[in-house]
Design a protein with these regions (language model features):
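A short mixed-secondary-structure module that forms the rim of ligand-binding clefts
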Residues: 42-80
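Short, surface-exposed beta-edge/turn micro-motifs
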Residues: 20-22, 48-50, 67-70, 123-126, ...
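A short, Trp-centered hydrophobic/proline-enriched beta-strand micro-motif
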Residues: 15-30, 70-74
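Conserved beta-strand in the GNAT
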Residues: 37-40
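Short, basic/aromatic recognition patches
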Residues: 2-22
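Charged, gly/pro-rich active-site loop segments
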Residues: 1-6, 85-172
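Histidine- and/or cysteine-centered catalytic micro-motif in compact active-site loops
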Residues: 28-30, 55-57, 75-77, 86-90
Length: 172
């Protein structure tokens, strides 16, 4: 796909992610097992396709140091739309980028200890995880809710797959 052809699909992807906000980030632990945890997707900014913030001393950072491949999954219960993103994570402590992305609600996830900067945009424990998207698949529901419910019930009764939307594939 040309970059011109890719842009509309990427914009759809970003639009759906912004509506859902919380991702389940899956990493591979040192023992080879997969581990998922809820992460709030931050607003879009240059430097990575998707941004997340975390404390510096968490198991996910050890996971990412050993294997930077991640999967991000999103699900919107109301519409049954879902997104699966695979990508490569990069860690940064870039203070300018942290200041650019900082949101007041981060304070809840960075408990105050001895340092008065804790919870602020100057908290030295903050690490950004930038994810560069490799590929994504997402279902865009393009039917009104009553039609979606009808399709689900019809599928349940007939054994056919409900036709509730359009599947999109994005590959960079």
């Amino acid at each position: 796909m040309t970059s011109d052809g890719l842009k509309p699909e990427l914009e759809k992807l970003y639009s759906h992610i912004e509506e859902i906000e919380i991702a389940m980030m899956t990493t591979r632990r040192a023992d080879g097992h997969l581990q998922s945890r809820a992460m709030a997707t931050q607003r879009r900014a240059a430097g990575a396709d998707l941004w997340f913030v975390t404390l510096e001393d968490t198991p996910k950072l050890r996971d990412l140091a050993a294997d930077p491949h991640v999967n991000l999954s999103y699900y919107k219960d109301r519409t049954r739309e879902w997104i699966s993103v695979s990508g490569i994570a990069r860690l940064t402590r870039d203070r300018d980028k942290i200041h650019e992305l900082y949101a007041p609600d981060w304070k809840a996830w960075f408990p105050k200890e001895a340092d008065p900067r804790h919870g602020s945009k100057d908290d030295p424990r903050m690490v950004l995880i930038g994810v560069d998207v490799h590929a994504a698949v997402f279902l865009e529901v393009n039917k009104p809710q009553p039609v979606v419910l009808f399709e689900v019930v019809k599928g349940w009764l007939t054994g056919s797959t409900p036709d509730i939307g359009e599947m999109h594939h994005v590959r960079k």
